[in-house]
């Protein structure tokens, strides 16, 4: 079974596939150790952590591929979906992005219909491409399966905030017809819209995106499953938690000249264990003179 096939099986299981957002090797390992079967690389999070910049079109194709490659290597055997933004160009660019991500070990990708430079789907000022342009990108990535480049493709549309929910659902439906594995209508604004998206796209593996502080109401996985969602993204939870913890630790250090209360920190050994030091010690002993 390929990594993409594993994701399809997980998405079709009794419970929805919940994907926590990760952005580096440590976050990926901690999410995996928490018990998640698969992960998603969040563009919002990588842009913040790697560049110190907002999700505003700054993160390049190669920067995202490099970030994905590093964290995928930290969790071997774990299916990872990567936020590929707009595919970084036209249909040919989207196909090249898929090739690069597949070579980096990714099991899937998210491909959206914003114009470049794109921005976070829960920000103002989004612009979307013509439907035909986006669908050409979807088709280009799907066609790679004929070459053995099988990606679990999540087709994301931001049309809800630009042209309305009807257009967003129509775009998602066409993407599914072309072979997208799951469809992602970004930023429905209330429970009624959430129900409609899940109902109208029930046969297309609808995706729910839970963004703390965003436009969409937050719902736990069981409620989303009852509506019919098959994939649930919590893409920025990790970076929000990390940012909060780091800001508090640095503020305490700056204010007191000493670190925060130890109860607010992982221990030295907890971190080294989380990144696999015991395994590396065993390897070192095995290969030492």
Where are these regions (language model features)?
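Alpha/beta enzyme core
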Residues: 2-234, 240, 248-251
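Short, low-complexity, intrinsically disordered N-terminal peptides in bacterial proteins
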Residues: 1-2, 289
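Extended, intrinsically disordered, low-complexity segments
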Residues: 143, 237-289
């Amino acid at each position: 079974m390929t990594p993409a096939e594993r994701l399809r099986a997980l998405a079709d299981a009794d419970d929805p596939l919940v994907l926590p957002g990760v952005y580096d090797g440590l976050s990926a390992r901690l999410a995996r150790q928490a018990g998640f079967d698969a992960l998603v690389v969040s563009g919002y999070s990588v842009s913040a952590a790697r560049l110190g910049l907002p999700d505003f079109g700054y993160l390049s194709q190669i920067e995202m591929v490099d970030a994905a490659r590093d964290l995928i290597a930290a969790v071997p055997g774990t299916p990872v979906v990567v936020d590929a933004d707009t595919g970084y160009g036209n249909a040919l660019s989207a196909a090249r992005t898929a090739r690069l991500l597949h070579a980096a070990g990714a099991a899937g990708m998210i491909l959206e219909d914003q114009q470049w430079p794109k921005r976070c789907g829960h920000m103002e000022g989004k612009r979307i491409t013509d439907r035909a342009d986006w669908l050409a990108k979807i088709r280009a990535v799907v066609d790679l399966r004929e070459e053995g480049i099988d990606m679990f493709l999540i087709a994301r549309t931001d049309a809800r905030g630009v042209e309305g929910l009807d257009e967003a659902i129509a775009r998602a439906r066409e993407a599914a017809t072309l072979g997208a594995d799951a469809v992602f209508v970004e930023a429905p604004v209330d429970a009624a819209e959430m129900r409609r998206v899940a109902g109208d796209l029930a046969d297309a593996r609808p995706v729910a995106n839970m963004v703390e502080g965003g436009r969409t109401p937050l719902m736990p996985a069981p409620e989303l499953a009852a509506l019919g969602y098959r994939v649930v993204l919590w893409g920025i939870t990790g970076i929000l938690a990390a940012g909060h913890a780091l800001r508090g630790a640095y503020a305490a250090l700056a204010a007191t000249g000493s670190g925060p209360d130890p109860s607010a920190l992982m221990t030295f050994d907890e971190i080294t264990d989380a990144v696999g030091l015991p395994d590396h010690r065993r390897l070192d002993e095995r290969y030492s003179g």
